[in-house]
């Protein structure tokens, strides 16, 4: 007999393959005994000398910056610098900036040619991996940057920042993001009156193993953008500053202890947007990123700053920080999820994985959370979540599983049908005997204790489950939805096969078919990823 038509099918979804780089926000600085000895011996001599030199440079930079910004509003400027202010800013401050980094031991190698303001009003620097990336700003002639308004109030460096006439961002202003984009566009289209605007389109620091998602703000104006690459080709990496890694003070001290730290700044040809890219900043950002990734010979991923926020949230939930990484840009776009939705799923994931030190869910923990025994049915459900077949579910797989498998199945029709299946005597409530009887059949477990699960659904402790209680529990626990739909499909499959069909083998057929289709969908859509 040919296999029956499957009434329910898993929703087709573009594949969500693992990124080429799992965690671009971690940096493990391992120092050998020789490295420690070298840093100690050089540090005794170099650190005091460099500290004195840097202090002297700052003593010269401070009065120059005061003169440049004298009489200017602290809240930002509305007109570009001209005359002697521009000369002091572009010539003197740039020279002093180079002296400052020279005093820190940096050897700067510049490749390519910086475009003029008319040729490329915006400079995009990547990969952004360190606070030392300010070197790119110095070598670009101190263009304007995007900075928080609070930074202007910082002692000494706040005054230096005012010299570059930054585009200011305010955390307290709800319209700040829109206003920032408008200001960047105004300067970019000024016909060369304003200095170039330098942006770090990744928006956060990575370990330079890939290029993450570029934010669209700097690409909205639709003007030519010059990519600027920054590399640190040193044997000992003392500059990479990531969310998981050494603190800034340690990196600064170790860098000062190095005899020389090499940095390469490369200016690529300006990228002129097509008509389509002018209308779609996302495509323009992706196009520029692709050019930079090709030159750097690095992969690209869809991680973004929101992944860093999820890492912090994972740490607060006692999970390993890397457990929160999901490639937020890809997940949010393909599954139509906002950050708050993913954060909520992280909290649910933490409730299941709290006893697991690795931040991954095993089948035992999955069964314990569902308050069900490990049965073939539950193992099949677990396999649907476990996309890579390694026997565990990480947070990324959990988000995809809940969104693609469970939530679409967790609708009013399914909940009503499932309630009717449990309500054997049709008295509009489910007793523990009815609940236990159906689960024993569905899971293929003769001796099944469902007391704890029944008690959790029975919110008022009345000894029976009403529809409202059942519905509320189902909506808050979408993990059960696939079990419900598989059981409903099982009933229809039995009807097509005939009454003589073995219940357990039919259940296994339905679950296996679902698993095969899910895997097939993932494989067939790899080209779309």
Swiss-Prot record:
Ca(2+) 3 binds at residues 458, 460, 462, 464, 469. Pathway: Lipid metabolism; phospholipid metabolism. It catalyses: a 1-acyl-sn-glycero-3-phosphocholine + an acyl-CoA = a 1,2-diacyl-sn-glycero-3-phosphocholine + CoA; a 1-O-alkyl-sn-glycero-3-phosphocholine + acetyl-CoA = a 1-O-alkyl-2-acetyl-sn-glycero-3-phosphocholine + CoA; a 1-acyl-sn-glycero-3-phosphate + an acyl-CoA = a 1,2-diacyl-sn-glycero-3-phosphate + CoA; a 1-O-(1Z-alkenyl)-sn-glycero-3-phosphocholine + an acyl-CoA = a 1-O-(1Z-alkenyl)-2-acyl-sn-glycero-3-phosphocholine + CoA. Signal peptide: none annotated. A motif (EGTC motif) lies at residues 202-205. The chain crosses the membrane at residues 51-71. SMART domains: EFh, PlsC. It is a single-pass type II membrane protein. InterPro entries: EF-hand-dom_pair, EF_Hand_1_Ca_BS, EF_hand_dom, LPCAT1-like, Plipid/glycerol_acylTrfase. Ca(2+) 1 binds at residues 386, 388, 390, 392, 397. It is found in: Endoplasmic reticulum membrane; Golgi apparatus membrane; Cell membrane; Lipid droplet. GO terms for cellular component: endoplasmic reticulum; endoplasmic reticulum membrane; Golgi membrane; lipid droplet; plasma membrane. The keyword Cell membrane applies. Its main location: endoplasmic reticulum. Keywords: Acyltransferase, Calcium, Cell membrane, Endoplasmic reticulum, Glycoprotein, Golgi apparatus, Lipid biosynthesis, Lipid droplet, Lipid metabolism, Membrane, Metal-binding, Phospholipid biosynthesis, Phospholipid metabolism, Repeat, Signal-anchor, Transferase, Transmembrane, Transmembrane helix. PANTHER family: LYSOPHOSPHATIDYLCHOLINE ACYLTRANSFERASE 2, PHOSPHOLIPID ACYLTRANSFERASE. Exhibits both acyltransferase and acetyltransferase activities. Activity is calcium-dependent. Catalyzes the conversion of lysophosphatidylcholine (1-acyl-sn-glycero-3-phosphocholine or LPC) into phosphatidylcholine (1,2-diacyl-sn-glycero-3-phosphocholine or PC). Catalyzes the conversion 1-acyl-sn-glycerol-3-phosphate (lysophosphatidic acid or LPA) into 1,2-diacyl-sn-glycerol-3-phosphate (phosphatidic acid or PA) by incorporating an acyl moiety at the sn-2 position of the glycerol backbone. This is Lysophosphatidylcholine acyltransferase 2. The lineage of its organism: Eukaryota, Metazoa, Chordata, Craniata, Vertebrata.
């Amino acid at each position: 007999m040919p296999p029956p038509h499957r009434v329910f099918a898993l929703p087709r979804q573009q594949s969500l393959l693992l990124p080429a780089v799992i965690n671009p926000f971690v940096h493990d600085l391992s120092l050998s005994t020789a490295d420690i000895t070298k840093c100690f011996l050089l540090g005794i001599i170099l650190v005091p000398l460099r500290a004195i030199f840097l202090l002297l440079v700052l003593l010269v930079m401070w009065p120059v910056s005061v003169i440049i910004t004298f009489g200017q509003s602290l809240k930002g400027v509305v007109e570009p610098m001209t005359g002697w202010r521009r000369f002091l800013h572009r010539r003197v401050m740039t020279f002093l900036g180079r002296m400052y980094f020279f005093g820190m031991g940096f050897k700067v190698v510049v490749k390519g040619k910086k475009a003029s303001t008319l040729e490329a009003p915006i400079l995009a620097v990547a990969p952004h991996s360190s606070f030392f990336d300010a070197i790119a700003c110095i070598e670009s002639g101190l263009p304007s940057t995007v900075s928080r308004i609070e930074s202007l109030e910082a002692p000494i460096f706040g005054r230096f920042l005012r010299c570059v006439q930054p585009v200011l961002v305010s955390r307290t202003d709800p319209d700040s993001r829109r206003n920032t984009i408008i200001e960047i566009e105004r300067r970019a289209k000024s016909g060369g009156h304003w200095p170039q605007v330098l942006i770090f389109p990744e928006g956060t620091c990575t370990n330079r193993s890939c290029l993450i998602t570029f934010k669209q703000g700097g690409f909205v104006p639709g003007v030519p953008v010059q990519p600027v690459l920054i590399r640190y080709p040193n044997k000992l990496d003392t500059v990479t500053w990531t969310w998981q890694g050494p603190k800034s003070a340690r990196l600064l001290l170790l860098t000062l202890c190095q005899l020389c730290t090499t940095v390469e700044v490369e200016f690529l040809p300006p990228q002129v947007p097509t008509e389509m890219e002018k209308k779609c900043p996302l495509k323009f950002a992706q196009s520029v990123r692709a050019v930079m990734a090709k030159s750097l010979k690095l992969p690209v991923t869809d991680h973004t700053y929101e992944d860093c926020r999820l890492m912090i949230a994972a740490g607060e939930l006692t999970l390993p920080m890397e457990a929160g990484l999901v490639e937020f840009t890809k997940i949010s776009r393909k599954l139509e999820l906002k950050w708050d939705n993913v954060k909520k799923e992280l909290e649910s994931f933490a409730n299941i994985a709290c006893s697991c030190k690795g931040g991954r869910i095993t089948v035992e923990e999955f069964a314990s959370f569902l308050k069900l025994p490990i049965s073939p049915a539950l193992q099949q459900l677990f396999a649907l979540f476990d996309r890579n077949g390694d026997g565990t579910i990480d947070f990324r797989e959990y988000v995809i599983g809940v969104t693609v498998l469970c939530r679409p199945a967790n609708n009013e029709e399914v909940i009503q049908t499932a309630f009717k299946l449990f309500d054997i005597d049709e008295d509009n409530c489910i007793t523990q005997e009815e609940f236990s009887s159906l689960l024993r059949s569905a899971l293929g477990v003769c001796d099944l204790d469902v007391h704890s699960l029944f008690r959790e659904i029975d919110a008022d402790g009345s000894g029976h489950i009403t529809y409202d209680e059942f519905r509320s529990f189902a909506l808050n626990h979408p993990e059960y939805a696939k079990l419900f739909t598989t059981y409903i499909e099982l009933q229809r499959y039995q009807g097509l096969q005939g009454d003589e069909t073995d219940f357990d083998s039919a259940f296994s057929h339905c679950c296996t078919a679902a698993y095969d289709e899910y895997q097939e969908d993932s494989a067939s859509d790899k080209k779309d990823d």
